[in-house]
């Protein structure tokens, strides 16, 4: 576009003892333990919700569901003066001497925002220590045309059902070589759909 961008953008410099990227079980536990010891902590999550795999997996921690435990830990972290908790914030650069760069989306999700709210903020963070707890990714089975619409990782289908309440198909075929796909099959079954499983 040739029109001038009227949005506001900011940059910020920050220092911390520990930067934790990712808010799944490992990231939350790491940030919480460090914060309780008095360290200055920044917790960064690129999605809008905290919890990572805890939002999808049927796990129990301290007699709470994974989601409830994540919510409890985030609530406690936000109350601590030595902790900065950021969602919609992606750490994308890791440079010499623990200098990291984080991209925070501050305004695009807001229906209404003040004229002083920036659209995005770029953080330059110097840290003593860094924990990269960005989670694991399901290992896909590679085959021709596996990038066509309707083909997805079983973990993606499970996330759609558990987190967003979206059923991704009525006659799913689950092609797998490990146990994790069976959790997705069970979730389909819980939603009234009978999946076909091809297990190598």
Report residues per predicted region.
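Residues forming the flavin
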Residues: 1-200
């Amino acid at each position: 576009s040739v029109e001038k961008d009227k949005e506001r953008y900011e940059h910020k410099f920050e220092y911390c003892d520990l930067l934790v990227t990712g808010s799944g079980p490992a990231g939350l536990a790491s940030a919480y333990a460090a914060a309780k010891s008095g360290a200055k902590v920044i917790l960064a999550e690129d999605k809008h919700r905290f919890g990572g795999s805890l939002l999808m997996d049927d796990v129990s921690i301290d007699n709470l569901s994974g989601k409830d435990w994540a919510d409890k830990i985030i609530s406690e972290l936000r109350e601590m003066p030595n902790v900065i908790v950021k969602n919609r914030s992606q750490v994308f650069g890791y440079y010499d001497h623990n200098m990291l760069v984080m991209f925070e989306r501050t305004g695009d999700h807001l229906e209404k925002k003040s004229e002083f709210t920036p659209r995005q903020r770029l953080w330059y963070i110097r840290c003593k220590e860094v924990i990269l707890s960005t989670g694991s990714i399901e290992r896909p089975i590679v085959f021709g045309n596996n990038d066509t619409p309707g083909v997805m990782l079983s973990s993606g289908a499970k996330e759609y059902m558990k987190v967003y309440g979206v059923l991704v198909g009525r006659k799913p075929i689950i092609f797998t070589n490990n146990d994790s796909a069976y959790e997705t099959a069970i979730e389909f079954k819980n939603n009234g759909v009978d999946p076909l499983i091809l297990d190598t």
